[in-house]
Structure formats: structure tokens, C-alpha cells
Amino acid sequence: MVFITKFARIGLQAARQLSVTPLGAVQARAIHLTSLLAKERRYTNKHEWVEVVSGSNAIVGISSYAQEALGDVVFAQLPEPGTELKQDDECGALESVKAASEVYSPVSGKVIEKNAEVEDTPALVNSSCYEKGWLFKVDLKNPKELEALMTEDQYKAFLSSSGDH
């Protein structure tokens, strides 16, 4: 304890000599809530997710629950870049050995990229639905639409209440 006290005293003396402002006097910078939410994934009741990655660009995919329900995905049809989408538009399809499912856009905007790796290797949807298995990128037309989508906690509650796990 004596060592810490001596060390602190030496540090304060050095700070005074160097004209360093003590930490308590430093003003905190404001952090905008939108920057904190930028990496938050939002979900639809049809099991698609959307995550803002930068500015108005977002990536879209299907949830872990959806990929498990589909089974081994063997085919992916994704929207072409340049396609204008409205929220809830059907924009693609995923087929597995046991089922087929349409993909709906969780947000309005213009498709800026499709995940060609998923079209070449559809199993990425199963092995990495949130990282490598995303479906397409979109330039958001109306970012406010994100507010109506479910947070991760709300989505988990939705799955529990609907009997889906």
C-alpha cells in the first residue's frame, strides 16, 4: 500500500510539472446512441435479420432458427445488385434437402451486393448464418424501419412464445 501511495504521489507531482489535467477534470465526450446501435442485429417474424454495417449499408440474412428449420441448404437464389426492394418484398429463395423457403427483405432499399459465395456454396447459410452466410447487402432507403423490427432479446421471446426454439 505504501508503494502505491508513493507511486501516486510521484505521478501527481509529474502531472503538475507537465501541466497535465487530472482525470477528474476531463469532460466526457458524448456518445451517440445510433453509433451504439449500428452493430445491433434486428429480426423479422419471418426469421430474416438485418444489421447496419456502415452508414446506410446493411447486411441481410436468415436466423440460426431458420437455417436449422430448413436443414442442409443446397440452393440459394439471391436478389441482383440494383434491385429496389420494399420492406417485406419477396426477394429470393433458399432450398434444402427437405424444404424450400422464400426470402423476404426486412427493410426497403437498393441491393448493392449479393453474397456470391452463398450462391456457390449454399451450405454457408448453415455453417455461418451470421458471418459468412449472409445473403445480400442493401442501401437502406428508410432506416426508421429498423425500429419496428425485433431486437435479439425480443426475437428470443418471440421464438419462445410461438413454441419455436
Swiss-Prot record:
Binds 1 lipoyl cofactor covalently. The keyword Nucleotide-binding does not apply. It comes from the Eukaryota. GO terms for cellular component: glycine cleavage complex; mitochondrial matrix; mitochondrion. InterPro entries: 2-oxoA_DH_lipoyl-BS (IPR003016), Biotin_lipoyl (IPR000089), GCV_H (IPR002930), GCV_H/Fam206 (IPR033753), GCV_H_sub (IPR017453), Single_hybrid_motif (IPR011053). It is found in: Mitochondrion. Its cofactor is (R)-lipoate. The modification N6-lipoyllysine is found at K98. Gene3D superfamilies: 2.40.50.100. Keywords: Lipoyl, Mitochondrion, Transit peptide. Residues 57-139 form the Lipoyl-binding domain. The keyword Nucleus does not apply. Signal peptide: none annotated. GO terms for biological process: glycine catabolic process; glycine decarboxylation via glycine cleavage system. It holds the Pfam family GCV_H. Belongs to the GcvH family. The glycine cleavage system catalyzes the degradation of glycine. The H protein shuttles the methylamine group of glycine from the P protein to the T protein. The glycine cleavage system is composed of four proteins: P, T, L and H. This is Glycine cleavage system H protein, mitochondrial. It comes from Drosophila melanogaster.
